[in-house]
Design a protein with these regions (language model features):
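Acidic (Asp/Glu)-rich catalytic clusters
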Residues: 32, 66, 108-115, 145-161
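C-terminal active-site subregion of NodB/CE4 polysaccharide deacetylases
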Residues: 1-94, 101, 172-322
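A short, conserved beta-to-alpha structural element at the edge of catalytic cores
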Residues: 114-135
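Short loop/turn segments at strand-loop or loop-helix junctions that form parts
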Residues: 38-43, 122-123, 162-165
Length: 322
């Protein structure tokens, strides 16, 4: 069934390629070119699963993006949306979770090629080396990044972002205190870990039910510049630039090309997000001052005395050929 679906999608892509190319040129001429933000989890050549892509596949994806699109940072993507000026079709590269294997090939390759990337991690999994629940349930508890690896990646130019403290499902959160712990406190912890300010936050799972109003509000109040979802959508001029919409870096190359070439059919099926959240009304005002105070406390604390020793060998890997 998957083979037939891929074949059908490939046929459709081939037949519509010229029309899509013209549409993309027209949008660019009007400064309305779409921005696609890709997210990956794990790049590795062992223990394959639904959230792992091989090294060769990943490099093929990025090389394709370099050839056909402009690869930009999340900050540049936001700037274009804020200024209502997107002159070229663009792509951003992001990672979620924080798997140790990413430091063996993918991240060093991105650094060597000076490709911007934002790398989202769950702080408690990094701090304690705790595997993710979904990996444990699958019988394969994969290693997570260490603090030293994150510091080395940041030193190499990779932007580190927040992915909560415990990879929590926000659809199950019932109190403001839980939300604050997973966003505000975790942001402060991560800033202390790496000695850099944290500007971006990726919501675990990132489906509409997790993208609650309280999540956006708490993130905004503690100094986060943008919140990333993961339900598959383009970023278009006129969209809210604080909400960065992302697309899965699908290992099936034809599906990836179909997304990046701007499939306007997908605009018809964009889900609506929750518009009401009792957490905002009940608890947010009484903790506003605390959230404002901690927005940069982590970076300040580290600057006042914590060590920033980086083991550069963590990122020294053999040359990878695309």
């Amino acid at each position: 069934v998957n083979f037939l679906r891929t074949l059908a999608l490939g046929t459709r892509y081939t037949l519509s390629r010229h029309r899509r190319s013209k549409r993309m040129r027209d949008l660019a001429a009007a400064n309305q070119a779409p921005i696609s933000v890709l997210f990956y989890h794990r790049v590795a050549d062992c223990h394959p699963n639904d959230w792992t892509i091989s090294t060769d596949q990943f490099i093929r994806h990025v090389e394709y993006c370099r050839e056909h699109y402009e690869i930009i940072s999340l900050g540049e993507a936001q700037k274009r949306l804020q200024e209502n000026c997107s002159p070229r079709p663009a792509v951003c590269i992001t990672f979620d979770d924080g798997y140790a294997e990413n430091m063996q090939s993918a991240i060093p390759w991105l650094i060597r090629n000076r490709i911007p990337c934002t790398y989202f991690v769950a702080t408690e999994h990094v701090r304690h080396g705790r595997p993710f629940a979904h990996d444990v349930e699958a019988g394969c508890p994969l290693a997570t990044n260490t603090i030293e690896q994150l510091r080395a990646a940041a030193k190499g130019g990779i932007e580190i972002g927040l992915h909560t403290a415990n990879h929590v499902d926000f659809n199950t959160i019932t109190t403001y205190q839980e939300l604050e712990s997973e966003i505000v406190d975790a942001k402060m912890d991560l800033e202390m870990m790496i000695g850099e300010p944290i500007d971006y936050f990726a919501v675990p799972f990132g489906m509409p039910e997790q993208m609650r109003p309280a999540v956006f509000e708490v993130a905004r109040r503690c100094g986060i510049r943008g919140v990333c979802s993961a339900f598959g959508a383009y970023n278009l001029v006129g969209d809210d630039p604080f909400h960065i919409r992302r697309i899965h870096g699908d290992p099936d190359f034809i599906r990836l090309r179909n997304w990046l070439s701007f499939d306007e059919r997908k605009l018809r099926y964009m889900p609506s997000l929750p518009t009401e959240d009792i957490l905002v009304e009940q608890n947010l005002s009484e903790r506003q001052d605390e959230a404002d105070v901690v927005s940069s406390a982590g970076a300040v604390a580290l600057a006042n005395g914590d060590s920033l020793f980086v083991d550069s060998s963590l990122l020294q890997q053999p040359t990878i050929h695309a």
